[in-house]
Amino acid sequence: MALNFKADTSALSRLPTKRKLAGQKAHLEMYRKLAKYSSVGHLLKFLAIDHPCPTRCQLKIFFEVCLGNRIADCVILLSCGETRLCYIIELKTCMSDSPSMYNETRLCQRSQGLCQLSDALRFISFNAPAGRQKWHLVPHLIFKSQRGLKTIYTETPQFPTNIIHSSPDKLASFFFSRADREVSEKVHAPDAGGQEKMAAKRRLLVPKSKALRARRQRLIERNKKACFKSQEKRARR
C-alpha cells in the first residue's frame, strides 16, 4: 500500500502529554522486545522485514542513534556472506490497532517519519567511516499499536542514496558511539526477578578455586573482627 499524502506535522505537537508519554513507553517496550530475541528470523518477522536467509545472518542492533539533526529509533546491521544491509528503523506508535492510515495523526506521523529517514540516510552516507565492503542502506518505517505492539503498517521508501562502502567493525563503532547510553541501559536492565537469576547464574559460574578463596577471605576477616573485640574486652578489664 503506497500513500502519497503530505500532512502538516504540527498536528503532532498538539497531542496531549499523556499520549506522548504512552508513545515513549511503547518505544521502550519495543526496544526491550527486540533486545530479547535470540533468533534473527523472529526479530525480522516482528519488524515485518523479509530476508531470504535470516538464520545465517549476523546481527548488531543499536537504539536511539543520533544521526545529525535526527535520532533513528533503531539501527540494525545485518550481514550474510557478501550481502550487507544497514536498516534504519523509524517507529511510530498508535493508540488503536486499526489498519486504516487515513486519519490526521497517522498521516502526520508518516510524513514526519519519511523526513526523518531521509535525513538519517543522508547523514550516514556523508559521515559513515570508509571501507571496502558495500553496504545497502534500507530505510524502514513501521507503525505499531501501543498495546501488544501489533504491526499496523510498514513502508520502505526509495531514496536516491542507498549504498555506502565501509567495514563491519568501523560501522558498528560509528553507530555505537552515537547510540543513547541511557536508553541502552534501560533496555538491557533486568527486572527484579531477572537480577536475582543473573546473580545466581554468576555465582554458579564462579570457579571453585575463586569461591574457596573468597570464603577463606571472609573467614579471615571474621576472625580478625573476633580477635579485635576480644582484645578490647581484655583492655577494659
Curated annotation (Swiss-Prot):
<dbReference type="Pfam" id="PF01646">
    <property type="entry name" value="Herpes_UL24"/>
</dbReference>
<protein>
    <recommendedName>
        <fullName>Protein UL24 homolog</fullName>
    </recommendedName>
</protein>
<comment type="similarity">
    <text>Belongs to the herpesviridae UL24 family.</text>
</comment>
<dbReference type="InterPro" id="IPR002580">
    <property type="entry name" value="Herpes_UL24"/>
</dbReference>
